[in-house]
């Protein structure tokens, strides 16, 4: 009944950087050609949302509807959309997969570039927005904008998933879990019997630990300055945990000593350029690989001595865990449904959508792994 009409609904609007989100009634325009309008059922709160809200994101544009870790149901589709219909169960994707650009055709990357420019501007592929509030246009975020009861996404930024999947859980496969898990499996390609170190034990770090374990790593060292996170890390497969604050010398030196020369694989799940250096330098000479997952602030640069690389260490990074999104997310949902992949264990808090600012507070306080908001 709502197809083709503007929908008025609730959304959390970020009017400006550094201020709490404001619950507002917004207007969501119908989907145009190649677009899909979704009724969002659940959305996670991720550090990336807070990063943009803080003003550190070079692409951050305000006012905006944030959120990029959601799941919902298709409300209506725009002209020419064939892969989705009203009622489909879907997960929006901030890394699309058009299947046609040279990036999609190359097995070495998952970074589809079809709508990259407009997505970076906070707009739909035709360079306009579908959101208004109080007469003002609002920007989209990461091509998803899940902090709204209804959102509009490009049809290439959407995965069709099992309708039996609980959306208040699988929404997390839209970012954090898939990212950390894929970093271990796809980007590092962790080998059986290896030793790994994971820096930062939030949702992404725990997912990286889970990936290392699935890949057969025998020693997985969790590193965090908050020892309250060590119990959960052990549940996910960490064989030991290390608090850099317990040591006077740099953490990489401690790790190199603990592991007889360094780890085979390390993962930086924080977004701190100093820790990125520590993670690389904790790697074993000759073959150690470090994967950067965390997003650093605008203008920050990484540093190490070239000698670290000349002597056989590899520095790489990943976006969305290297998964080609449209084809991979439905499989990840299936793995979860078949109990091959943990998701429920990441959800520490489930709150009504109106409590979104409380969700951000829990995250900043280190009290939540993932907080899911339900509409």
From Swiss-Prot:
Family affiliation: Belongs to the zinc-containing alcohol dehydrogenase family. Class-III subfamily.
Organism (species): Gadus morhua
Entries under Gene3D superfamilies matching the protein: Medium-chain alcohol dehydrogenases, catalytic domain, NAD(P)-binding Rossmann-like Domain
Claim: Acetylation is one of the keywords in the record: yes
Name listed for the protein in its UniProt record: Alcohol dehydrogenase class-3 chain H
Cofactors: Zn(2+)
Matching Pfam families: ADH_N, ADH_zinc_N
Primary location group: cytoplasm
């Amino acid at each position: 009944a709502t197809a083709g009409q503007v929908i008025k609904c609730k959304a959390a609007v970020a009017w400006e950087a550094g201020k709490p989100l404001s619950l507002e009634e917004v207007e969501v325009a119908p989907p145009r050609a190649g677009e899909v309008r979704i009724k969002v059922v659940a959305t996670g709160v991720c550090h990336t949302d807070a990063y943009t809200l803080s003003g550190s994101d070079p692409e951050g544009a305000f006012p905006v509807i944030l959120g990029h870790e959601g799941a919902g149901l298709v409300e209506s589709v725009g002209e020419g959309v064939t892969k989705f219909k009203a009622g489909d169960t879907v997960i929006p994707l901030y890394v699309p997969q058009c299947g046609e650009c040279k990036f999609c055709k190359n097995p070495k990357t998952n970074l589809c570039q079809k709508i990259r420019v407009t997505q970076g501007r906070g707009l739909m592929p035709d360079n306009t927005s579908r959101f208004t509030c109080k007469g003002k246009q609002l920007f989209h975020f990461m091509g998803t904008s899940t902090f709204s009861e209804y959102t509009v996404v490009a049809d290439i930024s959407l995965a069709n998933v099992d309708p039996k999947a609980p959306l208040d859980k699988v929404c997390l496969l839209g970012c954090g879990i898939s990212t950390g898990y894929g970093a271990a499996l796809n980007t590092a390609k962790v080998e059986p019997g290896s030793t790994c170190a994971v820096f930062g034990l939030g949702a992404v770090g725990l997912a990286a630990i889970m990936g290392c374990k699935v890949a057969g790593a025998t020693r997985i060292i969790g590193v965090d300055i908050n020892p309250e996170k060590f119990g959960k890390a052990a549940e996910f497969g960490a064989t030991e945990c290390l608090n850099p604050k317990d040591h006077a010398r740099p953490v990489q030196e401690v790790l190199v000593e603990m592991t007889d020369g360094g780890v085979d694989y390390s993962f930086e799940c924080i977004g701190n350029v100093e820790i990125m250096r520590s993670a690389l330098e904790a790697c074993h000479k000759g073959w150690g690989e470090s994967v950067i997952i965390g997003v650093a602030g605008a203008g920050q640069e990484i540093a190490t001595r070239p000698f670290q690389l000349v002597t056989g260490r590899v520095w790489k990074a990943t976006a969305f865990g290297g998964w080609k999104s449209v084809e991979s997310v439905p499989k990840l949902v299936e793995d979860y449904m078949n109990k091959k992949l943990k998701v429920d264990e990441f959800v520490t808090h489930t709150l009504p959508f109106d409590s979104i600012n409380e969700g951000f507070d829990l995250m900043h306080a280190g009290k939540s792994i993932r907080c899911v908001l339900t509409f």
